[in-house]
Amino acid sequence: MNAITSAPAAQTVHVPLGERAYDILIGPGLIARAGAEIASRLKGRKAAIITDENVAPLYLDALVASLDAAGIASAAVVLPAGEKTKSFEHLMTACDKVLEARVERNGCVIALGGGVIGDLSGFAAGIVRRGVRFVQVPTSLLAQVDSSVGGKTGINSRHGKNLIGVFHQPDLVLADTDVLNSLSEREFRAGYAEVAKYGLIDKPDFFAWLEANWKAVFTGGAARIEAIATSCQAKADVVVADERENGQRALLNLGHTFGHALEAATAYDSRRLVHGEGVSIGMVLAHEFSARMNLASPDDARRVERHLQAVGLPTRMAEIPGELPPAEVLMDAIAQDKKVKGGKLTFILTRGIGQSFVADDVPASEVISFLREKHP
């Protein structure tokens, strides 16, 4: 880990994907610089901004002004906030706005929002005119460290989360750390679950650093930028090695198989559970299941749980408000998850902190038994 200095210097993470390479800029004041940064990289001078009703009042005017100053004409569509926006209905609304704005293939779609807006906007950018340029301006911690990087886009289906989508890499990611100051504590904590995930995958030193420095990350400044940059670099490394999720990129789904099932079980109701909270519970369950399978020490699961509890994240299914369906229904959601190949359950399990691996033949009977223990 880099030493923390008092001055929050901006950082750049480069994602080397050949002709589709791009930069992730991380630091304060980037929305004000967005127009100049986009104009220096893209030839088109038309943009469609896709945002939501929570983010638009805070940052849309500043983004439009920045684009105007750089000679980029823009039109915006404001969608409802929340996971349920990832639907065909709202996807078509977004696509219509891109076409209405006459954005050509050298123009761009700009996602101004959190993970939901980024996922939907990237999907729209990937299918309109068979692909237009795409810029991410993520406004949540979760989006800055996870969903804005890597090119996975999509919407939800009644069968599960993110099951319909395309790979469409952004041309630029502008992670303005100033916008994180407007997040609620719950939203920031939810994003932090994805930060911790990178340490648990294969960076034990980073996880230890987070255990020691998480309060500084929550406060802001240099520690926050360092945590975001380290997370983005970790994801970029995995994406470059396995862009289309044919192998090791699946490691990024640590905690997500259980987490997605819990999100589905709560009908994506953010009052009960948001994505990062599901991932938090899912990462603890993944470590506990690994211990049950004699792959890891129970002490590791307890260490993960202690840290996530310390930052205020839920770590147990019992902490989710309201009733959850029985283990068999959760198992059905797991089986529908996209991390299933040939009918075999694929989980990201662990041999210890920072020692995660892809297990592609997990017995369903063991999972059902485990879920019954955790959710009688």
Swiss-Prot record:
Source organism, top-level taxon: Bacteria
Name of protein: 3-dehydroquinate synthase
GO MF terms, alphabetically ordered: 3-dehydroquinate synthase activity; metal ion binding; nucleotide binding
Binding site for Zn(2+): E194, H256, H275
GO cellular component, as recorded: cytoplasm
Binding residue positions for NAD(+): G115, V116, I117, G118, D119, T139, S140, K152, K161
InterPro entries: Dehydroquinate_synthase (IPR050071), DHQ_synth_AroB (IPR016037), DHQ_synth_fam (IPR030963), DHQS/DOIS_N (IPR030960), DHQS_C (IPR056179)
Record SUPFAM superfamilies: Dehydroquinate synthase-like
Pathway note: Metabolic intermediate biosynthesis; chorismate biosynthesis; chorismate from D-erythrose 4-phosphate and phosphoenolpyruvate: step 2/7
Chemical reaction(s) catalysed: 7-phospho-2-dehydro-3-deoxy-D-arabino-heptonate = 3-dehydroquinate + phosphate
Cofactor note text: Binds 1 divalent metal cation per subunit. Can use either Co(2+) or Zn(2+).
GO biological process: amino acid biosynthetic process; aromatic amino acid family biosynthetic process; chorismate biosynthetic process
Primary location recorded for the protein, binned into one broad class: cytoplasm
Protein's job: Catalyzes the conversion of 3-deoxy-D-arabino-heptulosonate 7-phosphate (DAHP) to dehydroquinate (DHQ).
